[in-house]
Protein backbone atom coordinates (compact mmCIF):
# COMPACT_ATOMS: atom_id res chain seq x y z
CA UNK A 1 0.00 0.00 0.00
CA UNK A 2 1.54 3.30 -1.06
CA UNK A 3 1.63 6.61 0.76
CA UNK A 4 -1.35 8.14 -1.04
CA UNK A 5 -3.57 5.23 -0.13
CA UNK A 6 -2.58 5.62 3.51
CA UNK A 7 -3.47 9.29 3.35
CA UNK A 8 -6.90 8.49 1.94
CA UNK A 9 -7.62 6.00 4.69
CA UNK A 10 -6.49 8.52 7.27
CA UNK A 11 -8.93 11.06 5.90
CA UNK A 12 -11.71 8.48 6.06
CA UNK A 13 -10.86 7.62 9.64
CA UNK A 14 -10.83 11.27 10.58
CA UNK A 15 -14.25 11.73 9.00
CA UNK A 16 -15.74 8.77 10.84
CA UNK A 17 -14.30 9.97 14.10
CA UNK A 18 -15.86 13.40 13.77
CA UNK A 19 -18.79 14.42 15.95
CA UNK A 20 -21.96 14.13 13.82
CA UNK A 21 -23.12 17.51 15.05
CA UNK A 22 -20.15 19.14 13.31
CA UNK A 23 -20.90 17.63 9.92
CA UNK A 24 -23.52 20.27 9.15
CA UNK A 25 -20.98 22.98 9.80
CA UNK A 26 -18.50 21.42 7.40
CA UNK A 27 -21.00 20.36 4.74
CA UNK A 28 -21.20 23.75 3.02
CA UNK A 29 -17.47 23.80 2.50
CA UNK A 30 -17.51 20.24 1.29
CA UNK A 31 -20.31 21.01 -1.14
CA UNK A 32 -18.47 24.04 -2.29
CA UNK A 33 -15.31 22.05 -2.82
CA UNK A 34 -16.74 18.82 -4.25
CA UNK A 35 -19.78 19.96 -6.17
CA UNK A 36 -18.99 23.39 -7.48
CA UNK A 37 -18.08 21.93 -10.84
CA UNK A 38 -21.33 20.01 -11.01
CA UNK A 39 -23.27 23.08 -9.97
CA UNK A 40 -21.85 25.15 -12.79
CA UNK A 41 -22.63 22.37 -15.23
CA UNK A 42 -26.23 22.25 -13.99
CA UNK A 43 -26.56 26.00 -14.38
CA UNK A 44 -25.43 25.76 -17.98
CA UNK A 45 -27.89 22.94 -18.62
CA UNK A 46 -30.71 24.91 -17.01
CA UNK A 47 -29.88 27.95 -19.13
CA UNK A 48 -29.93 25.83 -22.26
CA UNK A 49 -33.23 24.29 -21.16
CA UNK A 50 -34.77 27.74 -20.62
CA UNK A 51 -33.61 28.88 -24.03
CA UNK A 52 -35.07 25.74 -25.55
CA UNK A 53 -38.35 26.27 -23.71
CA UNK A 54 -38.48 29.86 -24.92
CA UNK A 55 -38.10 28.75 -28.51
CA UNK A 56 -40.72 26.07 -27.99
CA UNK A 57 -43.21 28.53 -26.51
CA UNK A 58 -42.54 30.96 -29.35
CA UNK A 59 -43.13 28.21 -31.86
CA UNK A 60 -46.26 27.12 -30.06
CA UNK A 61 -47.68 30.65 -30.23
CA UNK A 62 -47.30 30.83 -33.97
CA UNK A 63 -50.23 30.00 -36.22
CA UNK A 64 -50.67 26.56 -37.68
CA UNK A 65 -50.08 27.12 -41.46
CA UNK A 66 -52.64 24.48 -42.38
CA UNK A 67 -55.25 25.99 -40.08
CA UNK A 68 -54.50 29.51 -41.34
CA UNK A 69 -55.06 28.37 -44.94
CA UNK A 70 -58.35 26.74 -43.94
CA UNK A 71 -59.46 30.01 -42.31
CA UNK A 72 -58.76 31.96 -45.52
CA UNK A 73 -60.65 29.40 -47.62
CA UNK A 74 -63.56 29.52 -45.19
CA UNK A 75 -63.78 33.30 -45.42
CA UNK A 76 -63.56 33.29 -49.24
CA UNK A 77 -66.24 30.64 -49.64
CA UNK A 78 -68.59 32.56 -47.37
CA UNK A 79 -67.96 35.78 -49.32
CA UNK A 80 -68.76 34.03 -52.62
CA UNK A 81 -71.96 32.61 -51.18
CA UNK A 82 -73.04 36.04 -49.94
CA UNK A 83 -72.46 37.58 -53.40
CA UNK A 84 -75.03 35.20 -54.87
CA UNK A 85 -77.57 36.23 -52.24
CA UNK A 86 -77.34 40.01 -52.75
CA UNK A 87 -76.23 43.02 -50.73
CA UNK A 88 -78.76 42.48 -47.96
CA UNK A 89 -76.35 40.02 -46.36
CA UNK A 90 -73.62 42.60 -45.66
CA UNK A 91 -74.38 42.49 -41.95
CA UNK A 92 -74.11 38.71 -41.93
CA UNK A 93 -70.79 38.95 -43.76
CA UNK A 94 -69.39 41.34 -41.16
CA UNK A 95 -70.50 39.03 -38.35
CA UNK A 96 -68.88 36.10 -40.09
CA UNK A 97 -65.61 38.01 -40.49
CA UNK A 98 -65.63 38.72 -36.76
CA UNK A 99 -66.10 35.02 -36.10
CA UNK A 100 -63.15 34.19 -38.35
CA UNK A 101 -60.95 36.66 -36.47
CA UNK A 102 -61.95 35.12 -33.15
CA UNK A 103 -61.15 31.63 -34.40
CA UNK A 104 -57.77 32.79 -35.66
CA UNK A 105 -56.95 34.27 -32.25
CA UNK A 106 -58.01 31.04 -30.57
CA UNK A 107 -55.67 29.12 -32.86
CA UNK A 108 -52.73 31.29 -31.74
CA UNK A 109 -53.00 30.48 -27.99
CA UNK A 110 -49.67 28.90 -26.85
CA UNK A 111 -49.61 25.66 -24.94
CA UNK A 112 -48.36 27.23 -21.70
CA UNK A 113 -51.40 29.53 -21.50
CA UNK A 114 -53.73 26.66 -22.23
CA UNK A 115 -52.08 24.59 -19.44
CA UNK A 116 -52.48 27.41 -16.94
CA UNK A 117 -56.16 27.77 -17.82
CA UNK A 118 -57.18 24.13 -17.49
CA UNK A 119 -55.82 21.09 -15.66
CA UNK A 120 -57.21 18.85 -18.37
CA UNK A 121 -55.02 20.54 -20.92
CA UNK A 122 -51.99 19.89 -18.70
CA UNK A 123 -52.55 16.17 -18.91
CA UNK A 124 -52.72 16.41 -22.70
CA UNK A 125 -49.78 18.81 -23.13
CA UNK A 126 -47.82 16.26 -25.14
CA UNK A 127 -50.59 15.91 -27.73
CA UNK A 128 -49.38 16.89 -31.19
CA UNK A 129 -52.35 19.11 -31.94
CA UNK A 130 -51.87 21.05 -28.69
CA UNK A 131 -48.21 21.67 -29.47
CA UNK A 132 -49.23 23.43 -32.66
CA UNK A 133 -51.46 25.85 -30.81
CA UNK A 134 -54.67 24.02 -31.71
CA UNK A 135 -56.18 20.59 -31.32
CA UNK A 136 -57.32 18.16 -34.04
CA UNK A 137 -60.96 18.66 -33.02
CA UNK A 138 -60.71 22.37 -33.73
CA UNK A 139 -59.25 21.67 -37.18
CA UNK A 140 -61.99 19.17 -37.91
CA UNK A 141 -64.66 21.74 -37.06
CA UNK A 142 -63.13 24.30 -39.43
CA UNK A 143 -62.63 21.67 -42.13
CA UNK A 144 -66.22 20.41 -41.91
CA UNK A 145 -67.58 23.95 -41.98
CA UNK A 146 -65.50 24.73 -45.08
CA UNK A 147 -66.75 21.59 -46.84
CA UNK A 148 -70.37 22.48 -46.10
CA UNK A 149 -69.88 26.03 -47.32
CA UNK A 150 -68.31 24.85 -50.57
CA UNK A 151 -71.16 22.39 -51.10
CA UNK A 152 -73.79 25.10 -50.58
CA UNK A 153 -71.89 27.47 -52.87
CA UNK A 154 -71.82 24.87 -55.63
CA UNK A 155 -75.55 24.32 -55.25
CA UNK A 156 -76.21 28.06 -55.56
CA UNK A 157 -73.99 28.35 -58.65
CA UNK A 158 -75.72 25.38 -60.29
CA UNK A 159 -79.16 26.78 -59.51
CA UNK A 160 -78.29 30.21 -60.93
CA UNK A 161 -76.85 28.65 -64.09
CA UNK A 162 -79.97 26.55 -64.65
CA UNK A 163 -82.24 29.55 -64.12
CA UNK A 164 -80.21 31.64 -66.58
CA UNK A 165 -80.34 28.93 -69.25
CA UNK A 166 -84.06 28.47 -68.76
CA UNK A 167 -84.67 32.20 -69.00
CA UNK A 168 -82.64 32.48 -72.22
CA UNK A 169 -84.35 29.47 -73.76
CA UNK A 170 -87.88 30.61 -72.95
CA UNK A 171 -87.26 34.28 -73.80
CA UNK A 172 -89.51 35.30 -70.92
CA UNK A 173 -88.83 38.08 -68.48
CA UNK A 174 -88.61 37.63 -64.73
CA UNK A 175 -92.11 38.94 -64.14
CA UNK A 176 -93.72 36.27 -66.28
CA UNK A 177 -91.56 33.58 -64.69
CA UNK A 178 -92.70 34.75 -61.28
CA UNK A 179 -96.33 34.75 -62.39
CA UNK A 180 -96.15 31.20 -63.72
CA UNK A 181 -94.46 30.05 -60.52
CA UNK A 182 -97.10 31.71 -58.37
CA UNK A 183 -99.75 30.32 -60.66
CA UNK A 184 -98.61 26.76 -60.03
CA UNK A 185 -98.34 27.42 -56.29
CA UNK A 186 -101.92 28.64 -56.22
CA UNK A 187 -103.18 25.60 -58.08
CA UNK A 188 -101.35 23.32 -55.67
CA UNK A 189 -102.59 25.25 -52.63
CA UNK A 190 -106.15 25.22 -53.93
CA UNK A 191 -106.30 21.46 -53.39
CA UNK A 192 -106.57 22.09 -49.67
CA UNK A 193 -104.76 18.82 -48.81
CA UNK A 194 -101.26 18.16 -47.58
CA UNK A 195 -100.87 14.76 -49.21
CA UNK A 196 -98.66 14.83 -52.31
CA UNK A 197 -100.93 12.28 -54.00
CA UNK A 198 -104.13 14.28 -53.43
CA UNK A 199 -102.94 17.88 -53.66
CA UNK A 200 -104.26 18.20 -57.23
CA UNK A 201 -107.73 16.75 -56.48
CA UNK A 202 -109.50 20.10 -56.83
CA UNK A 203 -112.95 20.69 -55.45
CA UNK A 204 -115.80 22.32 -57.38
CA UNK A 205 -115.21 26.03 -57.84
CA UNK A 206 -111.63 25.97 -56.59
CA UNK A 207 -110.22 26.00 -60.13
CA UNK A 208 -112.42 29.01 -60.88
CA UNK A 209 -110.89 30.83 -57.93
CA UNK A 210 -107.38 29.89 -59.04
CA UNK A 211 -107.94 31.22 -62.56
CA UNK A 212 -109.47 34.40 -61.17
CA UNK A 213 -106.36 34.96 -59.08
CA UNK A 214 -104.19 34.35 -62.14
CA UNK A 215 -106.08 36.93 -64.17
CA UNK A 216 -105.84 39.41 -61.31
CA UNK A 217 -102.09 39.04 -61.30
CA UNK A 218 -101.85 39.45 -65.05
CA UNK A 219 -103.72 42.76 -64.86
CA UNK A 220 -101.75 44.05 -61.88
CA UNK A 221 -99.68 47.22 -62.01
CA UNK A 222 -96.55 45.27 -61.23
CA UNK A 223 -96.90 43.28 -64.46
CA UNK A 224 -98.45 45.71 -66.95
CA UNK A 225 -97.35 49.22 -65.97
CA UNK A 226 -93.89 49.25 -67.58
CA UNK A 227 -94.93 47.49 -70.85
CA UNK A 228 -97.95 49.78 -71.23
CA UNK A 229 -95.87 52.87 -70.53
CA UNK A 230 -93.33 51.83 -73.15
CA UNK A 231 -96.10 51.03 -75.61
CA UNK A 232 -97.63 54.49 -75.15
CA UNK A 233 -94.29 56.13 -75.97
CA UNK A 234 -93.82 53.99 -79.06
CA UNK A 235 -97.35 54.77 -80.21
CA UNK A 236 -96.49 58.49 -80.11
CA UNK A 237 -93.36 57.95 -82.20
CA UNK A 238 -95.26 55.78 -84.66
CA UNK A 239 -98.00 58.38 -85.21
CA UNK A 240 -95.39 61.06 -85.89
CA UNK A 241 -93.67 58.92 -88.50
CA UNK A 242 -96.63 57.08 -90.07
CA UNK A 243 -99.79 58.97 -89.14
CA UNK A 244 -100.16 60.55 -92.59
CA UNK A 245 -99.27 57.49 -94.68
CA UNK A 246 -102.01 56.33 -97.05
CA UNK A 247 -101.27 52.66 -96.39
CA UNK A 248 -102.50 53.04 -92.79
CA UNK A 249 -105.52 55.19 -93.64
CA UNK A 250 -108.05 52.38 -93.20
CA UNK A 251 -106.78 51.36 -89.76
CA UNK A 252 -105.64 54.69 -88.40
CA UNK A 253 -108.86 55.02 -86.37
CA UNK A 254 -108.29 51.62 -84.76
CA UNK A 255 -104.71 52.51 -83.95
CA UNK A 256 -105.77 55.77 -82.33
CA UNK A 257 -108.30 53.92 -80.20
CA UNK A 258 -105.60 51.46 -79.15
CA UNK A 259 -103.36 54.36 -78.20
CA UNK A 260 -106.14 55.95 -76.13
CA UNK A 261 -106.78 52.69 -74.27
CA UNK A 262 -103.10 52.22 -73.49
CA UNK A 263 -102.86 55.83 -72.34
CA UNK A 264 -105.86 55.39 -70.03
CA UNK A 265 -104.42 52.23 -68.49
CA UNK A 266 -101.12 54.00 -67.78
CA UNK A 267 -102.97 56.95 -66.26
CA UNK A 268 -104.90 54.59 -63.97
CA UNK A 269 -101.70 52.98 -62.76
CA UNK A 270 -100.20 56.42 -62.09
CA UNK A 271 -103.09 57.62 -59.92
CA UNK A 272 -102.00 58.68 -56.45
CA UNK A 273 -104.88 56.75 -54.92
CA UNK A 274 -104.45 53.71 -57.17
CA UNK A 275 -105.77 50.56 -55.57
CA UNK A 276 -105.60 47.10 -57.11
CA UNK A 277 -109.05 46.02 -55.96
CA UNK A 278 -110.65 49.34 -56.76
CA UNK A 279 -109.38 49.70 -60.35
CA UNK A 280 -108.90 46.13 -61.55
CA UNK A 281 -112.35 45.89 -63.15
CA UNK A 282 -111.76 48.97 -65.29
CA UNK A 283 -108.30 47.78 -66.31
CA UNK A 284 -109.74 44.40 -67.30
CA UNK A 285 -112.41 46.07 -69.44
CA UNK A 286 -109.81 48.17 -71.23
CA UNK A 287 -107.62 45.14 -71.88
CA UNK A 288 -110.58 43.21 -73.29
CA UNK A 289 -111.40 46.08 -75.64
CA UNK A 290 -107.76 46.43 -76.63
CA UNK A 291 -107.62 42.75 -77.54
CA UNK A 292 -110.82 42.97 -79.59
CA UNK A 293 -109.36 45.78 -81.68
CA UNK A 294 -106.84 43.36 -83.14
CA UNK A 295 -103.20 43.79 -84.07
CA UNK A 296 -101.23 46.85 -83.09
CA UNK A 297 -98.61 48.58 -85.27
CA UNK A 298 -96.25 48.46 -82.30
CA UNK A 299 -93.74 45.60 -82.38
CA UNK A 300 -92.13 46.10 -78.97
CA UNK A 301 -90.85 42.93 -77.35
CA UNK A 302 -92.48 44.01 -74.07
CA UNK A 303 -95.76 45.01 -75.66
CA UNK A 304 -98.78 43.13 -74.34
CA UNK A 305 -100.01 43.05 -77.94
CA UNK A 306 -96.95 41.51 -79.57
CA UNK A 307 -97.65 38.97 -82.27
CA UNK A 308 -97.22 35.27 -81.63
CA UNK A 309 -98.81 32.24 -80.07
CA UNK A 310 -97.91 33.32 -76.55
CA UNK A 311 -99.92 36.52 -76.90
CA UNK A 312 -102.88 34.71 -78.41
CA UNK A 313 -102.92 32.30 -75.50
CA UNK A 314 -102.73 35.17 -73.02
CA UNK A 315 -105.61 37.00 -74.64
CA UNK A 316 -107.67 33.83 -74.72
CA UNK A 317 -107.14 33.50 -70.99
CA UNK A 318 -108.25 37.10 -70.50
CA UNK A 319 -111.50 36.25 -72.31
CA UNK A 320 -112.33 33.38 -69.94
CA UNK A 321 -115.61 33.84 -68.14
CA UNK A 322 -115.98 32.32 -64.69
CA UNK A 323 -119.39 30.94 -65.72
CA UNK A 324 -118.13 29.41 -68.96
CA UNK A 325 -119.37 25.76 -69.13
CA UNK A 326 -116.07 24.79 -70.76
CA UNK A 327 -114.30 25.74 -67.56
CA UNK A 328 -115.20 22.37 -66.08
CA UNK A 329 -113.34 20.60 -68.87
CA UNK A 330 -110.34 22.85 -68.30
CA UNK A 331 -110.48 21.91 -64.63
CA UNK A 332 -110.38 18.21 -65.50
CA UNK A 333 -107.58 18.61 -68.06
CA UNK A 334 -105.36 20.55 -65.67
CA UNK A 335 -105.98 18.06 -62.88
CA UNK A 336 -105.15 15.07 -65.08
CA UNK A 337 -102.04 16.79 -66.42
CA UNK A 338 -100.76 17.61 -62.95
CA UNK A 339 -101.29 14.03 -61.77
CA UNK A 340 -99.29 12.70 -64.72
CA UNK A 341 -96.37 14.94 -63.82
Swiss-Prot record:
Residue numbers carrying Phosphoserine: 61, 303
A GO CC term assigned to this protein in UniProt = endoplasmic reticulum membrane
In the UniProt record, the signal sequence range is none
Modified-residue entries (Cysteine methyl ester), positions:
338
Pfam families membership: Pex19
- Annotated region (Disordered) at 1-26, 39-66, 109-141, 293-312, 318-341
Q: Basic and acidic residues compositional bias: what residue ranges? A: 39-53, 330-341
> Which residues are annotated with the lipid modification S-farnesyl cysteine?
338
According to the UniProt entry, its GO molecular function terms are: peroxisome membrane targeting sequence binding
Does the record's keyword annotation contain Endoplasmic reticulum?
yes
The conditions that induce or repress this protein are given as: By oleic acid (at protein level).
Subunit (UniProt): Interacts (farnesylated) with PEX3; farnesylation is required for this interaction. Interacts with PEX2, PEX5, PEX10, PEX11, PEX12, PEX13, PEX14, PEX17, PEX22, PEX25, PEX30 and PEX32; the interaction requires well-defined PEX19-binding sites within the peroxisomal membrane protein targeting signal (mPTS) of the PMPs and is independent on the presence of PEX3. Interacts with VPS1.
Which family, according to the similarity comment? Belongs to the peroxin-19 family.
General function of this protein: Required for proper post-translational import and stabilization of peroxisomal membrane proteins (PMPs). Acts as a cytosolic import receptor for PMPs and delivers them to the docking factor PEX3 at the peroxisomal membrane for subsequent insertion into the membrane. Acts as a chaperone in stabilizing or maintaining PMPs in the lipid bilayer. Directs PEX17, a peripheral component of the peroxisomal matrix protein translocation machinery, to peroxisomes. Stabilizes VPS1, a protein required for peroxisomal fission, at the peroxisomal membrane.
Name listed for the protein in its UniProt record: Peroxisomal membrane protein import receptor PEX19
Q: Which organism is it from?
A: Saccharomyces cerevisiae (strain YJM789) (Baker's yeast)
Amino acid sequence: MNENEYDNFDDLDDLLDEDPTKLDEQSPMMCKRRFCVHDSENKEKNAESKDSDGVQVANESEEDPELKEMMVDLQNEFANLMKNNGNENNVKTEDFNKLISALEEAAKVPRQQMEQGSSSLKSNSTDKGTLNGSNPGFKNIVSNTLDRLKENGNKVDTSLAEETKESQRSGQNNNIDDILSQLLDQMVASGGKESAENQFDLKDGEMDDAITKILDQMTSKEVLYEPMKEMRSEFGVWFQENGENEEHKEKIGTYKRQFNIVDEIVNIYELKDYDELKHKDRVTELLDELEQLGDSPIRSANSPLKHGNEEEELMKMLEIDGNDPNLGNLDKELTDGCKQQ
